[in-house]
Amino acid sequence: SLIANPNCSVSQMLIAIEPIHKKFQIDLLNIATYQAVSGSGIDAIKELNSQIKDVNVEPIVYPKKIAFNVIPQCDIFLDNNFTKEEMKVSWETKKILDPNIEVTATCVRVPVINGHSEAVFFRTKETVNKDDIVDLLSESAGIKVIDNPADQKYPTPLENANDTEDVYVGRIRTQIINEESWVSMWIVADNVYGKGAALNAVQIIEMLIKENKLC
């Protein structure tokens, strides 16, 4: 049997929204990812560091210079003008969470060494408020809520994506738009040590061994 194992950007999002979908039924989702260069490997990290020291260093790993820049392209462009990474977000979300969810993604590479960040905006079938979301996520395994706008408390890659398996959620907002319930969130996770594809694979194997489903 084959088991779907999402990539790092999809994994951290699904961990954060799965409890919400289970209780309030997400039917439309828009996500913008801000992906660290470590997701492209050691050569990408070296390229960023080299360009920070000398902005004239030409790009090899990326199509444009990554230092002091933001590149709205992760992976190659497909015929529909989305990148392959953006389509993976849609495909894997539908495959793992719910095939009926409409998903649109914009994947962006940012000059950060480690830690993927995501701005997620989604609609729920059931009416929901911020307290509902905070309470639900605070009780969910593997999720840490940092959300206190008055004290400027919210997760960032520098502070919260360092050798941790947890997914951090903040900037939680709810709105009623045209009588529909919408939620906005900010999600941060360590894409290398934490909720990356490699760790997911290990945890899936551990679960199968525990349940005696791996021969």
Language-model segments: residues:
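Active-site-lining helix/loop region of Rossmann-like oxidoreductase modules
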Residues: 3, 11-136
